[in-house]
């Protein structure tokens, strides 16, 4: 980002669980507005902490209440309007809820890490999967 101060602040989570064989599955979401596969996240509301944003956005986009695990690496990039953006992510586990398709996310899939890596649209999301695996 060339040191530009982020104009857009956002937060989200990588929701994960163990499958029946002890492997790791992660939730990947499809956003029809961008036609991409990524992880649930969204912009911070005024006065909201990154953690509050992550919890709210994950619930709004997926229907899942979560418990926070380790903070993962932050991601910096330019958004679709070419504004510098900073997104902070956490490893998360589901405590309650169920997915219902909505305007922001029309599909959500629990996938093994290798399949998630193949499906996500952005390289920085593949890097986040590496961070998740190291953190859990």
Model-derived regions, located:
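A residue-level structural signature of the nucleotidyltransferase/glycosyltransferase Rossmann-like core
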Residues: 6-8, 36, 108, 121
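Short, solvent-exposed aromatic-acidic interface loops
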Residues: 29-35
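Residue-level signal for short segments within beta-strands and strand-turn junctions
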Residues: 15-17, 30, 93-94
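Short, well-ordered strand-loop elements centered on a beta-strand within folded domains, enriched
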Residues: 22-28, 98-101
